[in-house]
C-alpha cells in the first residue's frame, strides 16, 4: 500500500510539472507574432537632493508594427527575435530590435554590474527549479540583462515578474550621464489583446557593489496588440534576407557566453558602436570577419 501511494505521488508530481511546463511554454509562445506596439515611460518620483537634477521627459511613441519571430523553439529553450517595421509605403524603415531567450531551469546568468560589465553567476538548483530565465540582448546580440523567475498562472492570468540590473535603455544612454544602472522590475503578462510589458524601474548611480544612490523611480507601459501577420510582411522579408548573418553573430556570442566568466565590453571601437558595424555596413558577413569584430569589443 505504501509503495502504491509513493508511486502515485511521484506520478502525480511528474504529470503536474509537465502540465505547468506546457502552460509556461504556451504563454511564452503567445508573445510571438505581429503586433501594433506603443512604448510609454514616465519618471514618477524624484528621490535625490541633487541641486541640478533634471528628470527625463515623458517618452511615448506612436504605434509601430513589431514582428516577434521564434528563431528557436524546443521544450526548454525558446528564442524570440523582435524586428520593428516603421513607416508606410512612402517611407519605411526596418530595425532589428531586441531579442529575448527563455531557458527553463537555467543555472548560468550574466548579471549587469555597471559600465558595460556583466558578472557571471552560477545558480544552485533550489534557486532555479521550475523557473524560466529571460535573457535579453541588445540589437547586436551583445548582453543586456537576465533574470530567473517562475511563470504564474492564476485567476485566468499568465505572467512572469523579475527584478534585475541593466544598462541604460537606448532612449536614455545618449542623454543621461548621472546614473549608470537601471534596476528593472519587469512584468510580462499575456492578455486578450496580445501581451503587456510593464516596468517599475529605479535609476541608480552605482559607485561600487556597496555604495549607490537611487535617483528616481520610473514606470513603463508597453502594449503589444496582436494584428494580422501580413502587417509585418516587410519585417519578415528583411529577416529572411538577413537571418543567416545573424545566426553567425548569435553563435559567436554563444561561444563567449559559454566560457562562464565575467564579461566587460568597450562601448566603441575606432569611433563606432558594434551595432553600427553590423547593421549599417556590408563588410561583415562571414564568420571570421564577425568574430574578429566582436573580439575587438571585448576587454581582456
Q: Model-found features: residue ranges?
A:
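Sec-dependent N-terminal signal peptides
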Residues: 2-13
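Amphipathic/hydrophobic helical signal segments and adjacent flexible N-terminal regions
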Residues: 18-28, 41-59, 75-82, 86, ...
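A glycine-anchored, Pro-Gly-centered beta-turn/N-cap motif
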Residues: 31-33
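Generic short beta-strand segments
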Residues: 36-45, 83, 163-171, 198-206
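Hydrophobic/aromatic beta-strand elements that line small-molecule binding cavities or substrate pockets
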Residues: 55-72, 81, 99-101, 183-190, ...
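Low-complexity, serine/threonine/proline-enriched polar segments
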Residues: 72-153
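Short helix-loop boundary/capping segments
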Residues: 125-183, 203-205
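Short proline/glycine-enriched turn/loop segments at secondary-structure junctions
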Residues: 208-214
Amino acid at each position: 500500500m505504501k509503495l502504491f501511494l509513493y508511486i502515485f505521488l511521484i506520478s502525480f508530481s511528474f504529470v503536474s510539472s509537465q502540465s505547468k511546463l506546457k502552460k509556461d511554454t504556451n504563454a511564452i509562445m503567445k508573445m510571438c507574432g505581429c503586433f501594433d506596439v506603443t512604448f510609454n515611460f514616465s519618471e514618477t518620483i524624484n528621490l535625490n537632493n541633487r541641486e541640478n537634477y533634471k528628470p527625463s521627459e515623458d517618452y511615448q511613441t506612436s504605434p509601430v508594427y513589431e514582428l516577434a519571430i521564434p528563431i528557436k523553439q524546443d521544450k526548454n529553450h525558446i528564442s524570440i527575435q523582435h524586428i520593428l517595421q516603421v513607416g508606410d509605403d512612402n517611407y519605411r524603415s526596418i530595425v532589428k530590435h531586441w531579442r529575448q531567450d527563455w531557458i527553463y531551469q537555467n543555472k548560468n546568468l550574466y548579471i549587469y554590474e555597471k559600465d558595460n560589465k556583466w558578472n557571471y553567476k552560477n545558480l544552485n538548483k533550489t534557486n532555479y527549479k521550475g523557473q524560466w530565465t529571460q535573457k535579453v540582448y541588445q540589437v547586436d546580440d551583445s548582453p543586456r540583462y537576465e533574470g530567473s523567475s517562475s511563470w504564474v498562472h492564476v485567476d485566468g492570468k499568465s505572467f512572469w515578474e523579475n527584478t534585475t540590473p541593466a544598462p541604460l535603455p537606448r532612449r536614455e544612454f545618449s542623454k543621461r550621464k548621472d546614473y549608470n544602472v537601471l534596476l528593472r522590475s519587469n512584468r510580462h503578462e499575456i492578455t486578450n489583446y496580445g501581451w503587456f510589458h510593464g516596468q517599475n524601474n529605479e535609476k541608480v548611480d552605482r559607485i561600487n557593489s556597496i555604495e549607490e544612490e537611487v535617483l528616481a523611480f520610473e514606470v513603463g507601459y508597453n502594449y503589444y496588440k496582436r494584428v494580422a501577420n501580413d502587417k509585418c510582411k516587410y519585417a519578415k522579408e528583411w529577416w529572411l534576407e538577413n537571418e543567416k548573418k545573424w545566426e553567425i553573430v548569435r553563435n559567436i556570442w554563444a561561444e563567449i557566453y559559454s566560457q562562464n566568466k565575467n564579461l566587460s565590453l568597450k562601448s566603441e571601437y575606432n569611433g563606432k558602436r558594434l551595432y553600427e558595424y553590423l547593421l549599417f555596413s556590408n563588410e561583415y558577413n562571414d564568420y571570421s570577419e564577425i568574430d574578429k569584430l566582436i573580439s575587438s569589443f571585448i576587454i581582456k
